[in-house]
């Protein structure tokens, strides 16, 4: 077996060591690139989070009725309360979202929340609404409805609040004040024994936005412009309460 000369052996060792060092450099570069990529990704994620802060206020908007339960009907047009409730609720949601708040609808379409229509559908519908509301952990819960009364002369909006809740009463006062100003009325908010209010964990109100038994209220509520005003007025009332600017009933 031929013997490897010392110079050849040294050269071989040199080449082996050189390759090892080159491999280590390549691995170091790869690790550096990966760490840099991770660092940049973290910076981008933080920047994105800072640019899109989590909303610090959540409102759940409950459009009353829906599906087989259309609510009351317009005295002249026959329009279903559920349709107008949903439109006002959608408008209110849009206004809140434009302000940077999070707004959640319990009902997004004309369908009810009771599943298959059968005995006990109303109770299932109400329970589903509250499940949606509780998952959202809202600061405020507001249910949108329209009223009906035996006397067709009665008109204007009426706000109800969760019984035994001082904060809900103050919220109702603030919203009622704004609606009174819009409709030139002087109503005071009332305690309301309603399932959606009783089952709410926080501040909760129910807004009867007008009387479909009154032709003037009905005619206004049939216009998109007035429904937008109603939504904006409720928004202002809630925001006034939120920032501690509400006073007594005007």
Q: How would you label these PLM feature ranges?
A:
Residues 2-4, 84, 101:
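Extracytoplasmic glycan-interaction modules
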């Amino acid at each position: 077996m031929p013997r490897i000369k010392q110079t050849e052996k040294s050269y071989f060792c040199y080449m082996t060591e050189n390759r090892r060092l080159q491999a280590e450099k390549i691995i170091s570069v790869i690790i550096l690139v990966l760490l840099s990529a991770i660092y940049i990704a973290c910076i981008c994620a933080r920047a994105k989070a800072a640019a899109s802060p989590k909303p610090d206020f959540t409102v759940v908007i409950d459009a009353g009725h829906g599906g087989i339960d259309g609510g009351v009907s317009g005295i002249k047009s026959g329009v279903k309360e559920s349709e107008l409730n949903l439109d006002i609720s959608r408008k209110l949601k849009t206004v809140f979202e434009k302000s940077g708040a999070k707004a959640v609808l319990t009902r997004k379409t004309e369908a009810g929340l009771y599943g298959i229509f059968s005995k006990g559908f109303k109770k299932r519908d109400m329970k589903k609404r509250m499940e949606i509301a509780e998952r959202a952990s809202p600061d405020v819960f507001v249910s949108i409805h329209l009223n009906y009364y035996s006397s067709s002369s009665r008109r204007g909006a009426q706000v109800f609040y969760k019984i035994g809740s001082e904060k809900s009463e103050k919220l109702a006062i603030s919203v009622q004040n704004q609606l009174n100003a819009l409709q030139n009325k002087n109503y005071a908010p009332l305690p309301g024994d309603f399932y959606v209010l009783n089952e709410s964990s926080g501040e909760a109100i129910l807004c009867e936005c007008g009387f479909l038994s009154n032709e003037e209220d009905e005619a206004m509520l049939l216009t998109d412009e007035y429904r937008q005003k109603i939504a904006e007025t409720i928004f202002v009332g809630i925001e006034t309460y939120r920032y501690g600017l509400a006073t007594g009933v005007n």
